[in-house]
Amino acid sequence: MDKNIVALGLMSGTSMDGIDASIIRSDGDEYIDIIGNLYLKYDPELKKKIQEFTNKINSLEDLKSNVEEYKNLERKITIKHQEIISEIYKKFEIRANIIGFHGQTILHKPLQNFSIQMGNAELLSQLSKTDVVYQFRQNDIKNGGQGAPLTPIYHHNLKKKLNLKMPVLFLNIGGIANYTFSKNDYFCAKDAGP
């Protein structure tokens, strides 16, 4: 890539506590400048609604039976993501060229070849007036992964940046724990439990 772009990444994990945002400048290869990070806690009412909805969705059939509730909650989650976008733009006085939107995981079944995240990328793009990339988990599963494609790449590049020569194991403990093993130019990653 011959120019640097400003990218904003949004992540809300299965712990359902809130949204993490990181804004960076990068050439997509060697150069990366972390401009800043921000966290926005879900308000108790929204968190409760997400948890209650997630607890009653155990299959795609459950989701189809609750589509109106899904759409209403998805809109609220998307608007909450727009709030953190506005906050991070204001705090660091910069706008992103592109946004990576994870969405809120409500059902993750990689062995059954699907993962469902709440979040309307089209609405977020309209609200933020920025292009949005999304469906990271779904695309990873379609390509044989377990639905966490970005963490292993980050861990592998972190090992290179820190100039660690020995094999390294990164453990990410969240709502769904996962690990990344990295040795030389080889790396692999898997979910490790709930």
Label for each model-derived stretch:
Residues 1-194:
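Short acidic/glycine-rich loops and adjacent helix/strand connectors
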